[in-house]
Amino acid sequence: MDYDPIKESLGRHFNRHPLLRKLFYLLLNILLLRSWHVRKALKKLSQTLPSSSKVLDAGMGFGQYSWWMARKFRGWNITAADIKSEQVADCNAFFRRERLGERFRAIEADLVRWTGTGKYDLVLCVDVMEHIEEDRKVFGSFFSMMNNGGYLVISTPSDLGGSDVHSENEKSFIGEHVRDGYSKAGITGKLLDAGFGKVSVSYTYGLSGSIAWKLSMKYPVIMLSASRLFFILLPFYYLAVMPFVILLNITDLNFSHAKGTGLLVIAEKNR
């Protein structure tokens, strides 16, 4: 199933007014479990990062993580890169309107070919690597872009049901994915080969998180792919399921998982 057309429709709708865009960011932070895990990791890393850190949001998408970081960590200077020119233009206009343009800029870039515009203390890469075939090249680029002692944070599907694939005969739920997910050993090995000195990988989307994903993402996407008329029903659907999704997300966030359909990866470049 192609997910990009649905994302683009949602993006255009919520980009009509700054308040709608802020509401969209809030909903993404609540509904997407990966956002909970990423924000928790960033809060922890912020205690060791410089207060004036230079940050790369690699594959920024709608820009919700850059928005959260720019408001949470007032000293951080953020560069956001994305391959889609429309999203780059939208983010730059929105951040300037919100008077954050001095600490944020979005640029159009293909991560496979782009080599950066400077050195970063933190590189954030959420829901990106499953779309890139030449992942080793990108990992190597990230390493070369980073300052010593910097961190790379990745959120990506695992090979244990990520992309909703549970057997060799199944196809990814998201048509744009070039791989169903990474194993812990696989992504660790690639990052070590790229030069990173320490790599930590933990499972996300355990049982409760997988249920939350189905309620918050899978079922709505299936409905919207069937007919755009379901956009009308979407607010009522989310009002009904949101309390359950929040509870499931909190549960997933606060327990460790022996296995899960997602991975949270933190790699450190040696000092």
List where the protein language model places each region.
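S-adenosyl-L-methionine-dependent methyltransferase catalytic module, highlighting the catalytic core
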Residues: D2-A41, Q64, I83-Q87, F94, ...
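Hydrophobic adenine-recognition pocket in adenosine-nucleotide-binding enzymes
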Residues: V128
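Conserved beta-strand/loop positions that form the S-adenosyl-L-methionine
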Residues: A58
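Short conserved loop adjoining the S-adenosyl-L-methionine
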Residues: R113-T117
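Glycine-rich helix-loop-beta junction characteristic of Rossmann-like nucleotide cofactor-binding loops
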Residues: L42-P50
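Conserved glycine-rich SAM-binding loop
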Residues: G61
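Class I SAM-dependent methyltransferase SAM/SAH-binding core
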Residues: Q64, W68, G75-L111
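A conserved beta-strand element that flanks and buttresses the S-adenosyl-L-methionine
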Residues: L124
